Amino acid sequence: MMKRFYYLFVFLSFILFSSQKVYGQASFFDAHVSKYGELEQVLGDKWDKIDSLVVHGPINEDDFKIMWKCSFEGKLTVLNLEDTQIEGRKIPDCALFNYEKQDATISVHLNIRKIILPDNLEEIGKYAFMKMKLEEINFPQNLRKIGRAAFGNCHWFKTNPVIPEGVTELPARCFMNCQCFDKVTLPTSLKIISDDCFYNTRVAEVNFPEGLDSIGNGAFYASDLKIADLPNSITKIASLTFSMCDRLRYIHIPENGYIDYIPNYFAAYDDSLERVDIPNTIKKVGTCAFDSNHMLKDIKLPNGLTYIGQNAFYKCAFDSIVFPVSLEYLGGGSGAYWKHIKKIYSLAPTPPYCAEDLINRGKGPFHGLTPNNIPVYVPIGSGEKYREAFGWNYFTNIIETDKFPTGIVSPKMSNNELCKVYGKGNELVIEIPNLLSSPIHYSIYSIEGTMIEQGNLIKSYTLRMSAKGVYIVRVGNTTHKIFM
């Protein structure tokens, strides 16, 4: 009997000792403060033993510094601010980030994993939660502004952000290097996605709301984005926006009249990119804009395009391509390593200028695995010009034709021109200096190949055009490309 009581005494003593040890650690603390800057006093000597902290009452920047200390030098991992009144309704700049202590070493991340913010919060300051082991946080509905790099380098951030209505800008590096969320919901109020906002994130799905105005440099660089369907409201796109996106399959740039330039490195090194919608307003494709997109098999270059930059389509998988009549400049390497190309069409009667490759000196736009014996179709009367022009002389099978995929018929050329054709304001002028003894046939086409007018002339003629653009005018056996 005494032996049984002995074992019972030992067991109860162990339970009592263990309970005192657990509760003695003060792993949870409910802090009530009555004024700004009081948190340190309320926590007392327990500050470095607290794992979960709930704060009630008014807090300010000084109180956030204490919370940072509780985590960086203590054990704090969970922070509940739901019942606080934050000064100015703003999380202060660098609220839970200390540049000197955390940025000196790349591996130093604050141990806070969960934060609950109050409903009346209106602003999160710059660098507020940067470089933290944060996994979960709420975005209050009253939130209107988020500061630069507020969540930058929060690698473990797994909450799929739902940005509240009223937020108009996502600032530079806002979610840079966040590695664990895969979907972002953007509000209709959003106007700007700034530089490097989702740089090197695992975000795969983003809605681009109507009303969005601009997307900054590298905004989705090296992300897991699958589709970039840009809204009609977009007026600005930037360099590196969609580069290094291994899972990106489709980019839609709207036909809205605002965007006339595809920036440098816009969507380069995208291993899965299969389709890009380029609007007819585009006049220039920048350096390396679509460089090394090995799955991009087809692209429709817009009528009116004048410039293609260095390496713009380097190593793409085109089987054919049509260079529009408006094209004037082909950058070095822009058609290099097209190992799948079967035919090329160039609609310009004058060969577009071919620049030297800045990396492979002495070579032009076409080289490497681009076969030089494929048919290159050019307008009738321009074959010899192409054969003699640098860059185009890479090809050995240049063929004159008046049949092009766009439907434009390119008639025969002649050096014995009887007239002068030009644009003047919104008028197209066919000037015949001397009255002709017999009528001469003329025809006017849009750049898409649509017949606008035809007839016979013996004297000068002026036609008022309904829209600006590029027109093909045939008078007798001569062809003119006119920019209105």
Tell where the protein language model's regions lie, with residue ranges.
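Low-complexity, Pro/Thr/Ser/Gly/Ala-rich linker/spacer regions in secreted
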Residues: V22-F28, I399-N415
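Short, T/G/N/S-enriched strand-turn elements that build extracellular solenoid repeat scaffolds
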Residues: G37-K46, D62-S71, K90-A95, Y127, ...
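C-terminal outer-membrane/trafficking sorting elements
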Residues: V409-M484
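Bacterial Sec-dependent N-terminal signal peptides
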Residues: M1-S27
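The feature captures the LRR N-terminal capping module
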Residues: Y23-D45
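Consensus positions within tandem repeat domains that build extended binding/scaffold surfaces
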Residues: A95, G125-A128, G147-G152, P171-C174, ...
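Structural signature of tandem-repeat unit edges
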Residues: A26-S34, D51-I59, K75-R89, Q102-E123, ...
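Membrane-proximal C-terminal cap and juxtamembrane stalk of leucine-rich repeat ectodomains
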Residues: F366-G407
